């Protein structure tokens, strides 16, 4: 007995590759250690998650620049070049999503923690994001 009628697909890491290193590795001229220090202490995952939770990108960026003025250019780059952090689509997962969409047997729901300010960038770039009946943030 199968009572499953809804499938949920996460966006970042499941359907779409996302990684700040796509921007910052170039900026740090390939120096992984320096890049990691910057991403772990200045523009950390925790800091980014605050914006994913709804905090203004502009306000968060300005506050971070005030804390680390010597890194202003790099801090402003974090959201200024966010689109470049979007890598490729995970084609196997997108193909699976398309199969479910074409069979029209399941409700398809998307799941993301991306900010309401960054999500439209992904929506514009990846057509398959429009296949979902709803999106949970």
Question: Where do the model's predicted regions map?
Answer:
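A metal-dependent, Asp-based hydrolase signature
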Residues: 48-79
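Short histidine/acidic/glycine/proline-rich micro-motifs that form metal-
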Residues: 15, 46-48, 81-87
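Short, acidic loop-to-helix structural element flanking the phosphoryl-transfer center
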Residues: 73-109
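Active-site neighborhood of HAD-like aspartate-dependent phosphohydrolases
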Residues: 1-43
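Substrate-recognition "cap/lid" segment bordering the active-site pocket of phosphatases
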Residues: 116-137
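Cofactor-binding loop segments of dinucleotide-utilizing enzymes, especially the Rossmann-like FAD-
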Residues: 113
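Generic structural signal for small/hydrophobic residues in well-ordered secondary structure
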Residues: 10-13, 54, 100, 110, ...
